[in-house]
Regions:
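Hydrophobic helical membrane-anchoring modules
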Residues: 1-20, 31, 154-157, 179-236
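The conserved acidic donor/metal-binding loop of glycosyltransferases
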Residues: 99-104
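Short, acidic, metal-binding catalytic loop of nucleotide-sugar glycosyltransferases
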Residues: 38-47
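Acceptor/aglycone-binding surface of glycosyltransferases and processive sugar-polymer synthases
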Residues: 71-89, 106-184, 210-231, 235
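Active-site beta-to-alpha loop of glycosyltransferases that engages the nucleotide-sugar donor
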Residues: 24-35, 58
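A conserved acidic beta->alpha catalytic loop
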Residues: 53-60
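Hydrophobic/aromatic residues located in beta-strands of well-ordered beta-sheets
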Residues: 22, 48-49, 123, 201
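Short aromatic/hydrophobic "clamp" motif used to bind/position activated sugar donors
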Residues: 95
Length: 236
């Protein structure tokens, strides 16, 4: 039988997995999606898995056959609207985001969720950048490091990884937070705005592995949107 969290506020809680939604945004991830979902189900058997999908391959079909809740993405398309839809589709207390390319450690899902449920954090950010991950190209590492440094100066807060795809959000934080879902680099705003507004944010270090499949990221577009979201989160 899966461990119970114990007590929180004097009340016995459900098994931790029943309080977690794992949210992923997918685009042509048929090579990885089966492995990632299987790994999640073994790590947190009772977790809900929600996928917002804009694929032209068999990603959605494979995910549904394995028990994931799949939401097909229609206009407005793009990473921001997909992430917003995935976060808001959860009916559970904690939403853990994950990229569906096998780069992130599913064994951290439960510990990160516990840091929200037990320790009172509103957001737990999994930073890949304690050092340069072997799986991350140098240009990506330097860009991420530079943007994190800029955000740290702007917010007077030690930011490590603006673009991490693995975070645990308290669902009530998502419900209260005001942000612009449109455009790229939404994770930047979803980290910086809670910091600015005084929510309890915890940053931990996680490992990062080589991805399965091809990346769909556009570096120049991502850089522009990162700068735009740093500015928006600080001043708007």
């Amino acid at each position: 039988m899966q461990d119970l969290i114990g007590t929180f506020g004097g009340t016995l809680l459900e098994p931790v997995g029943r309080q977690i939604t794992v949210a992923m945004m997918t685009r042509n991830e048929e090579r990885a999606v089966g492995k990632v979902i299987g790994d999640i189900q073994r790590a947190v058997p009772d977790a809900e898995i929600v996928i917002v999908d804009s694929s032209s391959d068999r990603t959605a079909e494979i995910a549904q056959s394995l028990g994931a809740k799949v939401i097909k993405q229609f206009p407005p398309r793009g990473y921001g609207p997909a992430m917003d839809k995935a976060l808001r589709s959860s009916g559970r207390e904690v939403v853990v985001t994950l990229d569906c390319d096998d780069t992130y450690p599913v064994e951290f899902i439960e510990p990160m969720a516990r840091m929200v449920l037990e320790d009172g954090n509103d957001l737990v950010d999994g930073s890949r950048l304690a050092g340069k991950p072997a799986a991350m190209p140098w240009i990506n590492f330097l860009a991420n490091w530079g943007f994190a440094g800029l955000a740290s100066l702007a917010f007077f807060y030690r930011v490590r990884d603006l673009h991490s795809g693995m975070r645990a959000y308290r669902k009530s934080l998502i419900d209260r937070l005001s942000y612009d879902m449109n455009g790229a680099a939404l994770p930047v705003e979803l980290l910086l705005r809670p910091i600015r507004e005084g929510y309890k944010v915890k940053i931990i270090t996680i490992p990062y592995r080589p991805r399965i499949g091809e990346s769909t990221m556009r570096p120049l577009q991502s850089a522009w949107w990162t700068l735009k979201r740093i500015y928006r989160s600080r001043f708007v």
